[in-house]
UniProtKB/Swiss-Prot annotation:
Listed InterPro entries: Integrase-like_N, TACO1_YebC-like_2nd/3rd_dom, TACO1_YebC_N, Transcrip_reg_TACO1-like, Transcrip_reg_TACO1-like_dom3, YebC-like
Species of origin: Paraburkholderia phytofirmans (strain DSM 17436 / LMG 22146 / PsJN)
Keywords assigned by UniProt, alphabetized: Cytoplasm, DNA-binding, Transcription, Transcription regulation
Main location: cytoplasm
Name recorded for this polypeptide: Probable transcriptional regulatory protein Bphyt_1301
Length: 242
């Protein structure tokens, strides 16, 4: 990725998430509840739930919290009922932004998302206004220095679609979302532990941001990320390291 370091961006993202662990847990609990409600409470037959539970354990969430969230999802414990809503919009210079939320009050959520956009130089779009610029994929990112040939062989055998070496030396493995659990297990069995592993919306092309525009765009993304109902924020903005 010319002009910016994907590896540095990922490390920044991980550090920011670690700094907001309380919020991370809240997001994961919502994801576990919704995954269990939609696909049942058995992680062996519910790939989405299995991924959410793995993320929860990676974030050091206690097993009791995980089990309670699963029970709420399948109806065994009273609790708020969340629905998933996606919003699309534009950031600085028309950069594409997707905001995935889980909410028990869609009126509150849309107002908060719209306010975050408008206050920070962006604006809400309509359904489908920017999502066509992204691909829904499973993504794994490995540190610079990872054995590329061995990783590529293991990834392609596991069913990955593509293996990409970035300019900074980091390596990305991409796969269909439904194959994500299978590919993840196969890579780990081959001795490869990704620094980042997620099902994501990957931009087809990225727009480079530097200087003041980069600061403004990051401020908008942070404002959206900090909303309680927001689960994920995706953008095609590549914000250069200062």
């Amino acid at each position: 990725m010319a002009g910016h370091s994907k590896w540095a961006n990922i490390k920044h993202k991980k550090a920011a998430a670690d700094a907001k662990r309380g919020k991370v847990w809240t997001r994961l609990i919502k994801e576990i509840q919704v995954a269990a409600r939609m696909g049942g409470g058995d992680i062996d037959s519910n790939p989405r739930l299995r991924l959410a539970v793995e993320k929860a354990y990676d974030a050091n969430m206690p097993k009791d919290n995980v089990n309670r969230a699963i029970q709420r999802g399948v109806g065994g414990v009273d609790g708020a009922s969340y629905e998933e809503i996606r919003y699309e919009g534009y950031g600085i210079g028309g950069a594409a932004v997707i905001v995935d939320t889980m909410t028990d009050n869609r009126t509150r959520t849309v107002a908060e998302v719209r306010h975050a956009f408008s206050k920070n130089g962006g604006n809400m779009g309509t359904d489908g206004s920017v999502s066509f610029m992204f691909d829904h994929v499973g993504q794994f990112l490995f540190a610079p220095g990872t054995a590329e040939d061995k990783l590529m062989e293991a990834a392609l055998e596991a069913g990955a679609d593509d293996v990409v070496t970035n300019d900074d030396g980091s390596i990305e493995v991409l796969c269909p979302p439904n194959d994500f659990p299978k590919v993840k297990s196969a890579l780990e069995a081959a001795g490869f532990k990704a620094e980042l592993a997620e099902v994501t919306m990957k931009p087809q092309t990225e727009v480079e941001f530097t200087g003041e525009d980069a600061v403004k765009m990051q401020k908008l993304l942070d404002a959206l990320e900090n909303l309680d109902d927001v689960q994920e924020v995706y953008t095609n903005a590549a914000i250069a390291d200062e």
